[in-house]
Amino acid sequence: VACKDFLTNKVDRSVTGKIATQQCCGEIQLPLNDCGVVALDYQGKRGIATSIGHAPAVGLISPENGSIMSIAEALTNVVLTPIEGGLEGISLSANWMWPCKNAGEDARLYRAVEAASDFAQALRINIPTRKDSLSMTQKYKNGDSVYSPGTVIISTVGEVQDIRKTVTPVVKPVEDSVLVYVDFGKSGQKLGGSALAQIVN
């Protein structure tokens, strides 16, 4: 929805000289990469990959699905780099952003955390660390209050076998290559969390 150029262009994206994959890619350096990859040293091919995922609009409809979608997005963002150990070689960090102490929000947070735990365990992925910001409410003197949608920001980290094999969204003229469309909507074309759903509701 908003251009990310300011955020990516105002900083040095190659600090340390070990950045193998940064935010931008392609001839005109658009911020399209789904994950970041950093080399472990200056000569080897191993590294560390990280990505994020969040789904605040989905969380408004269902805190459970918001958690699951956040994890799913973070994982699909890091899937195109060769992680040591595959899926089980990825660790997650969960940053819970929630307007607690408002009616029903503590219960929604509990359901969201439980869903994240169940989903991660089913995938055999650990969540060894977390952070929380549980006072996401702004109160005014006239009695009005505004609070943020409860959401979890998921970060992934995993060791990369070969930093040279990370796939980026740059279409390259490689002979005998194909573009593959993967339909993740087998459960139906749900519109929850979409711009249309926000307008209708």
What is the role of each PLM region?
Residues 1-201:
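Glycine/proline-enriched, intrinsically flexible loops and inter-domain linkers
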